[in-house]
């Protein structure tokens, strides 16, 4: 793990310390929503709790939701984009993609700022601390059907 000579405390952010030259920014300042459709020639991607964003073809278990026959409304995802399953984010179904492909129109796709390191963003945005924030900031009817709105 890389170490730095100086750190600063971030008490409003879980009372942690970060390298002193790092900025603390809200998600909306480093990400913007995008929705590019009609990319039906790209591979199908999905978001899983245990892996984040992966090619759909790499998973073998049965799915409860069938893939649509018409992929024209599916959204383009590029490597480095943050993909959020807005109904399952509270459980951790989020990730920064390493792949280019398309995801369900039910997902939220955010283009991340180029200054972010994708691997670190994936680690942070999938961390327990962030997943807890998705739970806190989601709305629900009952305890299972929760949605997070961007």
Predicted regions and their residues:
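Residue-level "contact hotspot" at macromolecular interaction interfaces
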Residues: 73-76
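Structural motif
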Residues: 78-81
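Short, charged beta-turn/beta-strand-edge "cap" motif at the junction between a beta-strand
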Residues: 89-92
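Short, well-ordered beta-strand elements within core beta-sheets of diverse protein domains
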Residues: 13-17, 108-113
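A generic structural signal for residues embedded in beta-strands
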Residues: 84-85
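Non-catalytic DNA-recognition/assembly elements of restriction-modification systems
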Residues: 5-39
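Basic, amphipathic alpha-helical recognition segments used for DNA target recognition
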Residues: 26-37, 99-100, 109-150
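DNA target-recognition patches
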Residues: 32-68
């Amino acid at each position: 793990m890389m170490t730095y000579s100086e750190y600063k405390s971030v008490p409003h952010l879980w009372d942690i310390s970060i390298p002193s030259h790092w900025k603390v920014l809200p998600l909306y300042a480093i990400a913007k929503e995008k929705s590019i459709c009609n990319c039906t020639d790209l591979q199908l991607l999905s978001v899983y709790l245990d892996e984040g964003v992966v090619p759909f073809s790499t998973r073998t278990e049965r799915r409860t939701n069938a893939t649509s026959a018409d992929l024209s409304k599916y959204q383009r995802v590029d490597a480095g984009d943050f993909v959020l399953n807005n109904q399952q984010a509270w459980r951790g179904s989020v990730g920064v993609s390493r792949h280019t492909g398309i995801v369900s129109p039910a997902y939220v796709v955010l283009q991340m700022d180029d200054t972010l390191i994708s691997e670190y963003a994936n680690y942070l945005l999938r961390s327990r601390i962030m997943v807890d924030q998705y739970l806190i900031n989601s709305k629900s009817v009952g305890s299972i059907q929760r949605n997070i709105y961007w």
